[in-house]
Amino acid sequence: MSIDRKKVEEHIRGLLVAIGENPDREGLKETPSRVAQMYQEVFEGISYTNDEIAEMFNKTFEEDLVIPKDNKEIVLVKDIDIFSYCEHHMALMYNMKVAVAYIPNDKILGLSKIARIADMVGKRLQLQERIGSDIAEIMQKITDSEDVAVIVEGQHACMTTRGIKNTGSRTTTTTLRGAFKTDTNLTNRLMMLYK
């Protein structure tokens, strides 16, 4: 599903009128078009399913890779910067850092692809918890590894700029799959690497 820029422009113009603004004044004349263009970029991930994202970034390396059957070595990419928008208020989720870990099975994924997956998943109306589970699902599909962990930290404008207005709060969510969920020693190793 692609974004209907024309409809977005019409609705943004209507929203400006509804909040008491004049959409024809100098500073707002191009706002509906600018917002539509911005939404096309920041909500790009809405256009793709998790399967399509997995296919898009499925660049694995298998040649010259010798992985023992009992492998418990962790690949961790952390401090991946993303942003998203809360699906409840359409408010920005910002200062987000994502960490993605997996235990290679028969494939390793190009590291930049992990960051691209996190970025694309964030470009949807989201819940922070779902960002983690979507990334984990995509990683499992690409790597054929059940052992995936995702940690997401971020701030939510729906908490910092409205309601309670708690500007210092950060939310951390974890998604643990496979051995990361069942093996306490492995989970502890992950958390030590994550710090």
UniProtKB/Swiss-Prot annotation:
Subunit structure: Homomer.
Single Gene Ontology BP annotation: tetrahydrofolate biosynthetic process
EC number: 3.5.4.16
Binding site for Zn(2+): 86, 89, 158
Top EC category: hydrolase
UniProt similarity note: Belongs to the GTP cyclohydrolase I family.
Gene3D superfamilies, per database record: 1.10.286.10, 3.30.1130.10
SUPFAM superfamilies associated with the record: Tetrahydrobiopterin biosynthesis enzymes-like
Source superkingdom: Bacteria
One Pfam family recorded for the sequence: GTP_cyclohydroI
Gene: folE
Protein name: GTP cyclohydrolase 1
Alphabetic keyword roster: GTP-binding, Hydrolase, Metal-binding, Nucleotide-binding, One-carbon metabolism, Zinc
A GO MF label: zinc ion binding
Catalytic activity: GTP + H2O = 7,8-dihydroneopterin 3'-triphosphate + formate + H(+)
Keyword hit for Mitochondrion: no
UniProt pathway annotation: Cofactor biosynthesis; 7,8-dihydroneopterin triphosphate biosynthesis; 7,8-dihydroneopterin triphosphate from GTP: step 1/1
GO CC term, one of those recorded: cytoplasm
HAMAP family per UniProt: FolE (MF_00223)
PROSITE patterns: GTP_CYCLOHYDROL_1_1
